[in-house]
Amino acid sequence: ICAFIVGATQRTPVNVLPHLYQIIGSFFDTKSITGSGDTIATLVFSSAAETLSRALIGFIIGMVLGYILALLMHLSHIVEKIAFPYLMIIQMLPILGMAPIVLSITGDISSARIIIAAILTFYPVSTNTLAGFKSVGRERHELMRSYGASKFQLYTKMLIPSAMSYFFTGLKISAP
């Protein structure tokens, strides 16, 4: 709305704030903007596809690592006591402050973006999945053990299915 008001007053030069019809028209223009013959539309769509693929790869990596860490923290209280404070520290650090550090470590902007997306996904998935594992009542544990269930059966038949709603809540929180 502000762009229309500023554009209507004609106080800004066209090279600073072009009219809306010029912006839309340039998107559909068939003139090449690069040496390889790309138009604006192909450049925008190819860049969007690259960004989406990096975000999806980082989301999958963070999801898998968060789930594995939650499983390990539930299996061993020592792992939970060691890992949980670091999880809290990672969550407390601002991602914009962490981005230059990740970029300097990796040296590649593409892999840095994937790592940042994984970090953003990692914390909500791991903490929510751990909460899901811990939400199973003691009575259910005792019932499964009275039926002679092994630890593997305890996880596959009771704990993992019970934690799925928490896991998907973590995914929903971490997805933008």
Residues covered by each model-derived region:
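Intracellular coupling helices
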Residues: 134-145, 152-153, 157
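Transmembrane alpha-helices
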Residues: 115, 119, 152-176
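Transmembrane-helix boundary motif in ABC transporter permease subunits
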Residues: 57-87
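Alpha-helical membrane-interface segments at transmembrane helix boundaries
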Residues: 45-53, 80, 87-90, 107, ...
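Hydrophobic alpha-helical transmembrane segments in multi-pass membrane proteins
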Residues: 50, 54-63, 96, 100, ...
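N-terminal signal-anchor/first transmembrane alpha helix
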Residues: 1-8
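Generic hydrophobic transmembrane alpha-helix motif, especially the helices
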Residues: 87-124, 131-132
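Periplasmic/extracellular loop-to-transmembrane helix junction in inner-membrane transport proteins
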Residues: 9-60
